[in-house]
């Protein structure tokens, strides 16, 4: 799912779930490979880990599934199969560090808005966790509508990097698009919508990054409204939108422009 819009829906993160699973194994093991998630702003729905062990893990997996899968997670599948013998694997310390990181990283809602009930203020998502070239890589997305809170989350990740002797790279930073209590553009669009459809539109705030935030930082007095067609299951393999609603958005936008 979308790491912003869907972050408060309680969906499991496959990467952090793998950490919980590995920490519960009662046999000694070393990690050979790890591959979970593909993008920082997507809640990962799959994670695969190859381990080297002399122990039997089937019973542990069954017990883990019994204790961790709820009625809301019926689509979750945990499978194990024998892999080919590996030539290389992580040492004991590196294996333990990877498991501790996956187990300890808080992925999800970090704070709710105090001014807008039900709106997520701050969140972080572990979108990618993999081992490549002998190195463990983790890619996260950090969001907040409050700049100091976003910095606090980044400082926490920076502290983790120091703790594990890791290199930290920050990229793709974008400013928050703060809600304007008084918006002439929003009022005009509400008026046009009412004329077209005979009812008021639903105006919502969302926990997601939008281009309006970037423009708002550069343009003094910037007033903006984001609109689009009906969409479902964003950032999933089942992502889709209503074509008919796209047509309605087009006509609505044309009428708004005529009024400006």
What do the predicted segments below correspond to?
Residues 119-208:
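Substrate-recognition/cap regions that form aromatic- and gly/pro-loop-enriched pockets
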Residues 41-48, 178-191, 214-218:
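Short glycine/threonine-rich loop-to-helix capping motif typified by GTGT followed
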Residues 114, 121-136, 141, 193, ...:
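Zn-dependent metallopeptidase/amidohydrolase metal-coordination segment
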Residues 22-29, 61-72, 106, 161-165, ...:
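Structural signal for hydrophobic packing residues in well-ordered secondary-structure cores
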Residues 1-143:
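Midchain, well-structured core segments that form catalytic/ion-binding scaffolds
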Residues 29, 51, 76, 166, ...:
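A structural micro-motif
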């Amino acid at each position: 799912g979308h790491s912003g819009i869907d972050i408060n829906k309680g969906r499991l993160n496959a990467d952090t779930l793998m950490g919980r699973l590995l920490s519960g194994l009662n046999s000694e093991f070393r990690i050979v490979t790890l591959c979970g998630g593909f993008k920082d702003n997507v809640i990962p729905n799959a994670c695969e880990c190859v381990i080297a062990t002399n122990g039997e893990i089937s019973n542990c997996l069954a017990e883990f599934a019994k204790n961790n899968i709820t009625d809301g997670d019926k689509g979750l599948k945990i499978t194990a199969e024998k892999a080919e013998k590996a030539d290389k694997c992580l040492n004991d310390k590196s294996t333990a560090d990877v498991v501790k990181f996956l187990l300890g990283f808080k992925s999800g809602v970090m704070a709710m808005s105090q001014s807008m009930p039900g709106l997520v203020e701050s969140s972080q998502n572990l979108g990618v966790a993999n081992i490549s070239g002998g190195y463990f890589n983790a890619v996260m997305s950090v969001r907040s509508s409050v700049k100091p809170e976003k910095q606090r989350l980044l400082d926490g990740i920076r502290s983790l990097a120091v703790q594990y002797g890791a290199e930290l790279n920050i990229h793709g930073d974008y400013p928050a698009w703060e809600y304007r209590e008084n918006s002439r553009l929003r009022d005009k669009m509400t008026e046009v919508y009412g004329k077209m459809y005979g009812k008021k539109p639903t105006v919502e705030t969302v926990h997601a990054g939008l281009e309006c935030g970037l423009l708002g930082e550069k343009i003094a007095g910037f007033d903006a409204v984001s609109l689009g067609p009906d969409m479902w299951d964003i950032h999933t393999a089942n992502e889709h939108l209503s074509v008919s609603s796209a047509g309605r958005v087009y006509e609505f936008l044309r009428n708004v422009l005529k009024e400006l």
